Amino acid sequence: MAIVKPFKAVRAHRDKAALVSSKSYDLYTPQMLESKLAFNPYTFLHIINPDYEDHKLELTDKLRFKLVHNRYLEFKEKKVLKKDTLSAFYIYQKITATNSFCGIISATSVEDYHNNVIKKHEGTLKEREILFENYLKNTGFNAEPVLLTYPDNNVVAAIIKKYQQKRAEYEFTTTDKDSHLLWVVDADDDIKQIIEAFKDIDILYIADGHHRSTSSCLLAKHLAKENPHHTGKEDYNFFMSYLLPEKELSIYEFNRFIKDLNGLTPDAFLTELDTFFSIENHGQEIYKPKEKHHFSMYLNGSFYALFLRKSVYNFKETLSKLDAEILYQTVLKPILGIEDIRNASKIMYSQNKSEGLELKTKVDSGDFKVSFGMLPTTIKELKEIVDADLLMPPKTTYIEPKLRSALIIYEF
């Protein structure tokens, strides 16, 4: 039984929604960031870059987060941001050139996270957990929701469809040609239906935002200890999430790029691969895998198809069937000597949306010796691994939609 809760969002006035909201901070190059800050006085980026006009400031994290909080208050005082008077759910739709995503922004329960109603598929880094917890504690808000996915639900789908027939509270297109629409759901009957519908859903799966959710849970635990009148209903007991039906989630694979062959020549490397794979040389013809346990490889000017020898490989449990794990156990670890795939300096990852051409260009540049591609992980595989209480290898999935920051802000 999943707990979802309406909340009073802080958000931009309708005429400034496109100007205030931004892409996630890490998607901006330094040049793009500089341009946004210089020419858009309303962008949320000013809040999270409080010392933009004085780059010489050397601040501790705590002081920087305090300045973020102050800039946030300034945006509210100037009426750039306002807090809704009624608690609501928010239906958000993002339309790209290839996909349309539509789900519900809600407060979700820390208790559900602890009780495994909200399940994760990736591990987190303690250092990042603590950093973001401190950010949340010192700023008092969260501007980027965790992406959760749930099994398709007819009741929720019907409510979303009903609101899509109405005028959106926000409707704008960004320079990347994506369209964004937002509807406010503050009618009591609709709120009750959404709450009841999610009570029938046993599990919500984290698709993106593992550190945000974990940090929110850490913060809730610490604030509860500091509050002698803690009831469990305080806003810090929830975190903002974007709930998206499984059928609308898009999962892409990450390509792997390796800087050296661990002392092997290309021919010796191919010989080592032959233990676990049947190998086809495709020359300059781009090869993309068509089935699970098939891999593409670019080495020494040629594309190769690698087909796993299933009679040799040991399928032990759910995780061992995952292509990213197969590549690690048969190639990256035993042949290329990469033990720690999260932190090893000789491996680089890139999400694959280029039809395989990137496998060639990055190796031909001389920066890498070999590259690998595979089919994307499916939502079915992701759920099987999570339900078996396992974690996926790092950089196994690149999941869309990527959500805008400060379209909706959650205060606690």
What are these regions (language model features)?
Residues 1-412:
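Surface-exposed, charge/polar-rich loops and edge strands
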